[in-house]
Amino acid sequence: MGNGKTTLVKEGIAKAINRPFAFIALGGASDSAFFDGHSYTYEGSHWGRIIDILIDSKCMNPIIYFDELDKVSETFKGEEIIHLLTHLTDPSQNSLFQDNYFPGVHIDLSKSLFIFSFNDETKVDRILKDRMYVINTKGFKPEDKIAICNDYILPELMDTFMFNKEDIIFEKEAVEYIIETHTEKEEGVRNLKRCLETIISKINIYNLSQTNSNDKQIPLTFEINNFSIPLTINKERVDSLLSKKEDKFKPPEHMYM
């Protein structure tokens, strides 16, 4: 949904309680061996992601954030993952966690903090959900998105593209226009950030093309009229930089060859 769940945990909770943060994308996990490793008797075997996290964090009480719990597949392999996660979150068992690479060695995970995120609660295993304290997060209001844009997203993007704060100025109406017309009415700010990144990236490319020392200009697929730094972004420039031009060589939709 893009309403800042990961950021809240990584930049908020982890820093507030001064614990290392580790991220695991459950949508990309193929089976339980990803977490608890393979037996050392197999060629090329390795310990699992949980042990990796403990090694990297150099402590036994990190925050382990499992993202997109509702994306775990409903296949047999997915059930294996759910069973392992159920074991990890059981206070009576998680002090005796074992990685297949280290048979017989008990790993105490009882001090670790496990946090899960999901968008569709109906797709979360009932037994696993029963072990959780569920906190519902809401989407942002337009004024919240503008504040997040000005205070966090724009400073981060300006720093990424090595612009000064005064180099690119977004009018408030321009940001409101992006939110209303280019973000598909999302509850979070993921598409808003993507749009702002596209705009600033194009400005950066255009600026580099104009300052190119070679006589031959770099050909671009877009134009920025009256370009100069500092540059003010209004609604007209938003439309120009975010417009999707049709590819004349692209075959019509639903046409098969």
Regions found by a protein language model. Give the residues of each.
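C-terminal engagement/docking regions of AAA+ P-loop ATPases
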Residues: R190, C195-M257
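Walker A/P-loop
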Residues: M1-L26, I55-D56, T86
